[in-house]
Protein backbone atom coordinates (compact mmCIF):
# COMPACT_ATOMS: atom_id res chain seq x y z
CA UNK A 1 0.00 0.00 0.00
CA UNK A 2 1.24 3.46 -0.90
CA UNK A 3 0.27 6.46 1.19
CA UNK A 4 0.78 9.96 -0.14
CA UNK A 5 0.79 13.06 2.03
CA UNK A 6 1.91 16.53 1.07
CA UNK A 7 4.83 17.71 3.14
CA UNK A 8 4.76 21.06 4.88
CA UNK A 9 8.15 22.11 3.55
CA UNK A 10 7.70 25.10 1.29
CA UNK A 11 11.21 26.02 0.17
CA UNK A 12 11.16 26.77 -3.54
CA UNK A 13 7.37 27.00 -3.84
CA UNK A 14 5.93 29.98 -5.68
CA UNK A 15 2.55 31.21 -4.51
CA UNK A 16 0.05 33.70 -5.89
CA UNK A 17 -2.32 35.37 -3.44
CA UNK A 18 -5.50 37.19 -4.45
CA UNK A 19 -7.15 39.54 -1.95
CA UNK A 20 -10.46 41.35 -2.29
CA UNK A 21 -10.50 45.07 -1.48
CA UNK A 22 -14.15 44.92 -0.37
CA UNK A 23 -14.04 44.48 3.42
CA UNK A 24 -10.33 45.30 3.13
CA UNK A 25 -9.88 45.41 6.90
CA UNK A 26 -10.63 41.68 6.99
CA UNK A 27 -8.75 40.90 3.77
CA UNK A 28 -5.60 42.56 5.10
CA UNK A 29 -5.69 40.45 8.27
CA UNK A 30 -6.17 37.29 6.20
CA UNK A 31 -3.23 38.32 4.01
CA UNK A 32 -1.07 38.84 7.10
CA UNK A 33 -1.97 35.33 8.25
CA UNK A 34 -1.22 33.79 4.86
CA UNK A 35 2.15 35.53 4.60
CA UNK A 36 3.01 34.40 8.12
CA UNK A 37 2.11 30.80 7.28
CA UNK A 38 4.10 30.80 4.06
CA UNK A 39 7.19 32.39 5.64
CA UNK A 40 7.13 30.06 8.66
CA UNK A 41 7.21 27.07 6.32
CA UNK A 42 10.07 28.35 4.17
CA UNK A 43 8.59 30.33 1.28
CA UNK A 44 10.80 33.29 0.33
CA UNK A 45 9.05 36.65 0.06
CA UNK A 46 10.29 37.07 -3.52
CA UNK A 47 8.38 33.87 -4.41
CA UNK A 48 5.04 35.38 -3.33
CA UNK A 49 2.94 37.65 -5.53
CA UNK A 50 -0.15 39.46 -4.21
CA UNK A 51 -2.91 40.69 -6.52
CA UNK A 52 -5.66 42.93 -5.17
CA UNK A 53 -9.08 42.72 -6.84
CA UNK A 54 -12.22 44.80 -6.24
CA UNK A 55 -14.08 42.03 -4.43
CA UNK A 56 -14.66 38.30 -4.10
CA UNK A 57 -16.63 38.03 -7.35
CA UNK A 58 -13.53 39.00 -9.37
CA UNK A 59 -11.29 36.38 -7.76
CA UNK A 60 -11.96 33.38 -10.03
CA UNK A 61 -10.77 35.23 -13.15
CA UNK A 62 -7.44 36.25 -11.61
CA UNK A 63 -7.11 32.86 -9.91
CA UNK A 64 -7.44 31.22 -13.33
CA UNK A 65 -4.81 33.54 -14.83
CA UNK A 66 -2.39 32.73 -11.99
CA UNK A 67 -3.14 29.00 -11.91
CA UNK A 68 -2.58 28.66 -15.67
CA UNK A 69 0.82 30.31 -15.35
CA UNK A 70 3.81 28.00 -14.83
CA UNK A 71 5.09 30.66 -12.43
CA UNK A 72 2.88 29.48 -9.52
CA UNK A 73 2.67 26.19 -7.63
CA UNK A 74 -0.45 27.28 -5.73
CA UNK A 75 -2.94 30.14 -5.52
CA UNK A 76 -4.69 31.45 -2.40
CA UNK A 77 -7.91 33.51 -2.56
CA UNK A 78 -8.66 35.69 0.47
CA UNK A 79 -11.51 38.00 1.32
CA UNK A 80 -14.81 38.37 3.12
CA UNK A 81 -18.42 38.36 2.03
CA UNK A 82 -20.62 39.52 4.90
CA UNK A 83 -24.35 38.93 4.79
CA UNK A 84 -26.54 41.96 4.32
CA UNK A 85 -30.29 42.38 4.03
CA UNK A 86 -30.58 41.26 0.39
CA UNK A 87 -30.00 38.02 -1.53
CA UNK A 88 -26.81 39.45 -3.11
CA UNK A 89 -24.76 37.62 -0.47
CA UNK A 90 -26.13 34.23 -1.56
CA UNK A 91 -25.33 34.82 -5.23
CA UNK A 92 -21.82 36.09 -4.59
CA UNK A 93 -20.92 33.28 -2.17
CA UNK A 94 -22.26 30.60 -4.50
CA UNK A 95 -20.55 31.88 -7.64
CA UNK A 96 -17.22 32.63 -5.98
CA UNK A 97 -16.96 29.22 -4.35
CA UNK A 98 -17.91 27.44 -7.59
CA UNK A 99 -15.58 29.62 -9.63
CA UNK A 100 -12.57 29.02 -7.40
CA UNK A 101 -13.23 25.27 -7.25
CA UNK A 102 -13.55 25.12 -11.04
CA UNK A 103 -10.23 26.89 -11.52
CA UNK A 104 -8.50 24.29 -9.40
CA UNK A 105 -10.14 21.41 -11.27
CA UNK A 106 -9.48 22.93 -14.71
CA UNK A 107 -5.82 23.73 -14.09
CA UNK A 108 -4.78 20.91 -11.77
CA UNK A 109 -3.27 23.41 -9.34
CA UNK A 110 -4.35 23.99 -5.76
CA UNK A 111 -6.49 27.11 -5.46
CA UNK A 112 -7.35 27.65 -1.82
CA UNK A 113 -10.70 29.12 -0.78
CA UNK A 114 -9.99 31.63 1.96
CA UNK A 115 -13.06 33.77 1.41
CA UNK A 116 -14.95 34.15 4.65
CA UNK A 117 -18.73 33.94 4.24
CA UNK A 118 -20.18 35.21 7.48
CA UNK A 119 -23.46 36.48 8.88
CA UNK A 120 -21.86 39.55 10.45
CA UNK A 121 -18.63 41.49 10.84
CA UNK A 122 -17.93 39.95 14.26
CA UNK A 123 -17.74 36.45 12.76
CA UNK A 124 -15.37 37.71 10.07
CA UNK A 125 -13.10 39.36 12.65
CA UNK A 126 -13.03 36.14 14.70
CA UNK A 127 -11.83 34.17 11.65
CA UNK A 128 -9.25 36.75 10.59
CA UNK A 129 -6.87 36.34 13.49
CA UNK A 130 -8.72 36.54 16.77
CA UNK A 131 -10.86 33.87 18.50
CA UNK A 132 -11.24 31.37 15.67
CA UNK A 133 -7.69 31.54 14.27
CA UNK A 134 -6.75 32.99 10.91
CA UNK A 135 -8.21 31.44 7.76
CA UNK A 136 -5.41 33.03 5.72
CA UNK A 137 -2.81 31.10 7.71
CA UNK A 138 -4.81 27.88 7.33
CA UNK A 139 -5.07 28.38 3.57
CA UNK A 140 -1.33 28.98 3.29
CA UNK A 141 -0.56 25.72 5.08
CA UNK A 142 -3.14 23.92 2.94
CA UNK A 143 -1.62 25.37 -0.23
CA UNK A 144 1.83 24.10 0.76
CA UNK A 145 0.49 20.64 1.53
CA UNK A 146 -1.51 20.41 -1.70
CA UNK A 147 1.30 21.74 -3.92
CA UNK A 148 3.67 19.12 -2.50
CA UNK A 149 1.08 16.35 -2.75
CA UNK A 150 0.46 17.13 -6.42
CA UNK A 151 4.21 16.97 -7.07
CA UNK A 152 4.34 13.60 -5.28
CA UNK A 153 1.58 11.93 -7.29
UniProtKB/Swiss-Prot annotation:
MF terms from GO for this chain are:
6,7-dimethyl-8-ribityllumazine synthase activity
CDD domains registered for this protein in UniProt: Lumazine_synthase-I
Q: Where does 5-amino-6-(D-ribitylamino)uracil bind?
A: 22, 56-58, 80-82, 113
The record's SUPFAM superfamilies line, in alphabetical order, gives: Lumazine synthase (SSF52121)
What's any one GO cellular component for it? cytosol
Top EC class of this enzyme: transferase
Name the positions where (2S)-2-hydroxy-3-oxobutyl phosphate binds: 85-86, 127
Q: Which reaction does it catalyse?
A: (2S)-2-hydroxy-3-oxobutyl phosphate + 5-amino-6-(D-ribitylamino)uracil = 6,7-dimethyl-8-(1-D-ribityl)lumazine + phosphate + 2 H2O + H(+)
Q: Which domain of life is it from?
A: Bacteria
EC annotation from Swiss-Prot or TrEMBL = 2.5.1.78
- Quote the Pfam families the UniProt record gives: DMRL_synthase
Its annotated function is as follows: Catalyzes the formation of 6,7-dimethyl-8-ribityllumazine by condensation of 5-amino-6-(D-ribitylamino)uracil with 3,4-dihydroxy-2-butanone 4-phosphate. This is the penultimate step in the biosynthesis of riboflavin.
The entry's family comment says:
Belongs to the DMRL synthase family.
Q: What is this protein called in UniProt? A: 6,7-dimethyl-8-ribityllumazine synthase
Amino acid sequence: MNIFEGKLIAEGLKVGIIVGRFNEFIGSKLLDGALDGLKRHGVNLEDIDVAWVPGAFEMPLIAKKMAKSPKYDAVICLGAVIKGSTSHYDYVCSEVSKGIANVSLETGKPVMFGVLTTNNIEQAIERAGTKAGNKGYECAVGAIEMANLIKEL
